[in-house]
Regions:
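Short alpha-helix in the alpha/beta-hydrolase fold that links the catalytic acid
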Residues: 201, 210, 224-233
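Acidic catalytic loop of the alpha/beta-hydrolase fold
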Residues: 219-223, 249-250
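Membrane-embedded segments
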Residues: 60-134
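An N-terminal hydrophobic leader/cap segment in hydrolases
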Residues: 8, 12-54
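Alpha/beta-hydrolase fold nucleophile elbow
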Residues: 140-151
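Active-site nucleophile loop of the alpha/beta-hydrolase fold
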Residues: 170-180, 197-201
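Short beta-strand/loop motif that positions the catalytic acidic residue
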Residues: 208-209, 214-220
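Catalytic histidine-centered segment of alpha/beta-hydrolase-like enzymes
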Residues: 247-257
Length: 274
């Protein structure tokens, strides 16, 4: 009997260790879900082809869309950072919801038509490069740029806001730390030791002085409201959040309140000088 129990425990231990090894070496596949552009979608996107841009960074092509409208303090450039499974061209079908802001939607490496492989380091490095490239090429002051990130993209926006002086930051379904999210979903694993790409936004949030608004989905089952609110509370600059109580993680932008909240914040920021 003792031998049977010991053998069972040994099998469980080996299985647990094997699972840890699998999670450690394959963690990128659990963090990033690159999405391409289907032929049918590519046909729909032809109407936006005049907005397409390609830039090269570290030998990789980064592809996206730049809607260059009149640039002024009242009409800033919004740089958008998508979620971990988001191909950002979906946002092009909501252009009418923005008034006169310029808009930049760039896909991460391996998303859409961008090449390469995504990682925390590459997302952060590319984001700074893209920011500087468009700011310099189109003579747009960094203080006339608003960063907007959704889910994982909120971590990218937070990182850029730490390293560049910007007009404001908008975070959709943000989180304080990917480690803490993983701990909530996988409490039996030592994720703090396993996670090589922690996206620890909360550690740099206090250093950011730009005003920030977060929009939170009340029924989010992926990023708990606690994770979002904790980031807001640690933000160095003026910050607040709005909760859309019936929205889920992937449906938040389907609610009119989402767009009303976004429009109100943009209107307030148009009057703000940096």
């Amino acid at each position: 009997m003792k031998t049977t129990i010991a053998n069972l425990l040994l099998i469980l231990f080996i299985f647990y260790c094997a699972t840890l090894a699998f999670l450690y070496f394959k963690q990128s596949s659990f963090i990033f879900f690159p999405t391409g552009i289907s032929k049918s979608k590519e046909f729909l996107l032809k109407q936006f082809s005049h907005f397409e841009v390609n830039i090269n960074h570290d030998g990789f092509n980064l592809h996206g869309w730049f809607i260059n409208r009149e640039s002024s303090p009242e009409h800033p450039l919004i740089i958008y950072y998508g979620g971990n499974a988001e191909e950002v061209s979906n946002n092009l079908f909501d252009l009418e919801k923005y008034e006169k802001e310029s808009l930049l939607f760039m896909n991460y490496r391996s998303y859409g038509k961008s090449t390469g492989s995504p990682s925390q380091a590459s997302l952060f490095s590319d984001a700074l490069f893209i920011f500087d490239h468009f700011s310099d090429k189109y003579n747009i002051s960094s203080t006339n740029i608003i960063l907007m990130g959704r889910s994982l993209g909120a971590a990218v926006a937070t990182y850029v806001a730490k390293h560049r002086q910007v007009k404001a930051v908008i975070l959709i379904s943000p989180f304080d730390s990917l480690v803490k999210i993983a701990q909530e979903h996988y409490p039996v694993f030592p994720v703090k030791l396993l996670l090589k790409q922690p996206f620890e936004s909360v550690q740099i949030a206090q250093e950011i002085t730009a005003p920030m608004m977060a929009i939170i989905a009340g029924q989010d089952r992926i990023i708990s409201n606690e994770r979002s609110v904790n980031l807001v509370e640690h933000w160095g600059g003026k910050s607040h959040y709005v909760t859309i109580k019936d929205a889920g993680h992937n449906t938040i932008s389907n609610y009119p309140k989402y767009w009303d909240t976004l429009r109100l914040f943009l209107s307030k920021m148009a009057k703000r000088s940096v």
